[in-house]
Swiss-Prot record:
GO biological-process terms attached to the record: translation
One of the Pfam families matching this protein, by short name: Ribosomal_S9
SUPFAM superfamilies tied to this protein: Ribosomal protein S5 domain 2-like
GO cellular component: cytosolic small ribosomal subunit
Family annotation (PANTHER family): RIBOSOMAL PROTEIN S9 (PTHR21569), SMALL RIBOSOMAL SUBUNIT PROTEIN US9M (PTHR21569:SF1)
Protein name (Swiss-Prot/TrEMBL): Small ribosomal subunit protein uS9
Entry keywords, A to Z: Ribonucleoprotein, Ribosomal protein
HAMAP family listed in its UniProt record: Ribosomal_uS9_B
Length: 130
């Protein structure tokens, strides 16, 4: 019989992560690289592990991620969102704890667009009264 696989899709800023959970030892692979190799910042790796900490399932699943778009921060948030959604398929009882931790909510904050006549989205040149 084939091993159980659980899938979830996560999004954050411009990043989209397709996540697969397979029962295993807790190894996380992002775009065919180890997570320590792919994401250099330890605090971002902690963000990725949050859903496992909330549901007390650390080391129970191997995670395979395909992520595109955005930078390290956006990709980490997308992976976290995808893992949380995949854990819901593992056990629907996780919904309450994941929802309370805010891990199932898609963070809708996006980069504000640059406006014409301004240097950035809100930065204008210095105002001179006279």
């Amino acid at each position: 019989m084939a091993q159980a696989q659980y899938a979830g899709t996560g999004r954050r800023k411009n990043a989209v992560a397709r996540v697969r959970l397979v029962p295993g030892t807790g190894k996380i692979t992002v775009n065919k690289k180890d997570v320590e190799e792919y994401i250099p910042h330890a605090d971002l790796r902690l963000i990725i592990n949050q859903p496992f900490a909330v549901t007390s399932t650390e080391g129970s699943y191997d995670v395979f991620v395909n992520v595109v778009g955005g930078g390290y921060g956006g990709q980490s948030g997308a992976i976290r969102h995808g893992i949380a959604r995949a854990l819901l398929q593992v056990d629907p009882d996780f919904r309450d704890s994941l929802k309370r931790a805010g891990l199932l909510t898609r963070d809708a904050r996006m980069v504000e667009r640059k406006k014409p006549g301004l240097k950035k989205a809100r930065k204008a040149s210095q105002f001179s009264k006279r």
